[in-house]
Amino acid sequence: MNSIQNLENSRSDHAQTIITKTTCPYCGVGCGVNIEVQHKTQGVAVQVAGDTEHPANFGRLCIKGSNLADTLGLETRVLNPMLGRKNHRSVTTWDVAIEKIADQFQSCIDQYGPESVAFYVSGQLLTEDYYVVNKFVKGYLGTANIDTNSRLCMSSAVAAHKRSFGEDIVPASYEDFEHADMVVLVGSNTAWCHPVLYQRIMQAKSQNPDLFVVVVDPRFTSTCEQADLHLPILPGQDVALFKGLLQYLYQHGYADHQFVESYTEGLQALLEANRTEQDFRAVVKRTGISAEKLQLLNTELD
């Protein structure tokens, strides 16, 4: 846990209670958490509560954050390599475990070739760790089958932010939801993946019934249930949708030309390149979104 701040340290003959402020380590909402630890004669008791003063969650926690205490003890943590399946595992040494893994890799490669094995590694490795594992997989085993959580999770966002804003930063705050007229969620089942943030959106909508919530997702998710408009887009056609929206907004006079001139580049070239293929009918055809729903989105943008 990072940036831990002790709030209370009360001592007695029987127990020492320490409450620390920290941040939930799971999703990107960054909820504040108060961890209460009691050091008793018979062990350590841990309780978790949302930080009511934290600007991200104001005391709210989702089920993952609420169960953080379950991850702090050593009772269910694997501390040694284990061999076996399900309830028939036994503790072994690192030497035996590494030899077992190597034998399995060698057997697959001998029988089916190096393309028969693959690695999926963490997004939290150090740069040096990434270098070593890539050398091992590509240079030694001879396969390109390696991927990380980073590519699916944040690398794409980093690239998009840098190209759009010049820096890997999100130029918005959660308070913006309370002042928004429209919220568009793209490919995000926010109700499940970021439930605390979703509650803030729904609270903003309850206070402002005119807030129009749009969900762009091939699936009908729990987030769609409370949305005003669900756009069941075909997979991989998000860019086509946004190019079409760009054309619509520009053609109907919604462009802030002073802002465009001062802070963007390449807009005219983009508009010209997509002038013929991104009209209303083309967007309907490519995205699979019905003309009625697409027109409703355009109308709400007006």
Predicted regions, residues:
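Active-site phosphate/pyrophosphate-binding segments
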Residues: 245, 262-302
